UniProtKB/Swiss-Prot annotation:
Name of the protein in its database record: Uroporphyrinogen decarboxylase
Pathway(s) of this molecule: Porphyrin-containing compound metabolism; protoporphyrin-IX biosynthesis; coproporphyrinogen-III from 5-aminolevulinate: step 4/4
Any single GO BP term: protoporphyrinogen IX biosynthetic process
Catalysed reactions listed for this entry: uroporphyrinogen III + 4 H(+) = coproporphyrinogen III + 4 CO2
Function as written in the Swiss-Prot or TrEMBL entry: Catalyzes the decarboxylation of four acetate groups of uroporphyrinogen-III to yield coproporphyrinogen-III.
Annotated binding of substrate, by residue: 23-27, 72, 148, 203, 321
Length: 356
């Protein structure tokens, strides 16, 4: 059953819980490091053959239930006219950040089919090698992309972002609409290239108060989801939304219209699922640091998550964030094998609800 992941996204019964891991292709893998020694990060992202090779590495190494295209959320911003580099020890840097309404007005219209064509080519290459295993495309969410564009890189407090949001609300919503259009078109293009599902990463939205999320973010993310569904119709894929520190936004996340909501490790899975509503599938939620623990503790924590899911159709096992750089490879393999061998309950009230 190679479609376990897609079936779980749609809350359909599966024979076991599917598992894939955010940042499953990364520096913790010696195969990845061997490639990284020869190429810069952006060169890897922008060379379809290399991106495809790296995407496939964890499939060969661990047999996870889905691949996620090797890419990054920020390169699509280059099509708008933002200058992006990745600096050693500093991470992504945008050299002409958005600080004034004029900066928003002068952003270039762009078509990601042209400006991020390398990722779409990588999707096509990977799709040919997966033999029916699902491929996940992704994008940053409008808010997270706006935060990077305004801050000029990462941030801990997002002071510039929030000040722009509060002090320039008209320009803020203009920026979010432009980014929403970019995100929707990028996701649609990935599906057209062969992606079977898409994930929207809203890495920094957990910094917002619920009132601010409702006022400045919610409708723009809703529009992305609605646009993807409307444009693709019956071909629309499962849509996943993920952010960290989102437990206080459960009421807002229920309104996004996505199929799957990601859960980080700061809330128990069953509590989050009840808050999000059982009309959603959920994805998560092992603390990435747990993979540094002894195998018996990894098993204990994974078992608890699976028990909290209770066999209800619609659980995709994942971490609550990306795999960390120095994670032991053998612990990743142990986790995948443990989850894939864990027996689902043969009868549960949740399963009976779906099958009736």
């Amino acid at each position: 059953m190679r479609d376990r992941f897609l079936r779980a996204c749609r809350r359909q019964p599966v024979d076991r819980t599917p598992i894939w891991l955010m940042r499953q292709a990364g520096r913790y893998m010696p195969e990845y490091r061997a490639v990284r020694e020869r190429y810069g990060f952006l060169q890897m992202v922008k060379t379809p053959e290399i991106a495809a090779e790296v995407t496939l590495q964890p499939i060969a190494a661990f047999g996870v239930d889905a691949a996620i295209i090797f890419a990054d959320i920020l390169p699509p911003l280059e099509g708008l006219g933002l200058r992006l580099t990745y600096e050693k020890g500093e991470g992504p840097v945008i050299h002409n950040p958005i600080r004034h309404p004029h900066d928003v007005a002068t952003l270039h219209p762009c078509d990601p089919r042209e400006t991020v064509a390398y990722t779409l080519d990588a999707v096509r290459l990977v799709k040919r090698e997966l033999n029916g295993l699902p491929l996940i495309g992704f994008s940053g969410a409008p808010f997270t992309l706006a935060s990077y564009a305004i801050e000029g890189g990462g941030s801990k407090e997002y002071r510039l972002t929030k000040r722009f949001m509060y002090e320039q609300p008209t320009a803020w919503h203009d920026l979010m609409e432009r980014l929403g259009t970019l995100v929707a078109e990028y996701l649609i293009a990935q599906v057209e290239a062969g992606a079977d599902a898409v994930q929207i990463f809203d890495s920094w939205a957990g910094t917002l108060a619920p009132a601010d999320y409702r006022a400045y973010v919610l409708r723009h993310t809703q529009n992305v989801v609605a646009t993807v569904r409307a444009r693709l119709g019956a071909a629309a894929p499962p849509i996943i939304y993920f952010g960290t520190d989102m437990a206080g936004l459960a009421g807002e996340l229920r309104q996004l219209g996505t199929d799957v909501l990601g859960v980080d490790w700061r809330i128990d899975l069953d509590v989050a699922w009840a808050q999000y509503g059982y009309e959603h599938a959920v994805q998560g939620n092992l603390d990435p640091m747990t993979l540094f623990a002894p195998p018996e503790l990894i098993a204990s924590r994974a078992r608890e998550i699976l028990q909290r899911a209770g066999g209800r159709p619609g659980h995709i096992f994942n971490l609550g964030h990306g795999i960390l750089t120095e994670t032991p490879v053998e612990h990743v393999r142990y986790l995948v094998e443990f989850v894939q061998s864990y027996p689902l309950p043969t009868t549960t009230p949740a399963l009976q609800e779906v099958m009736q």
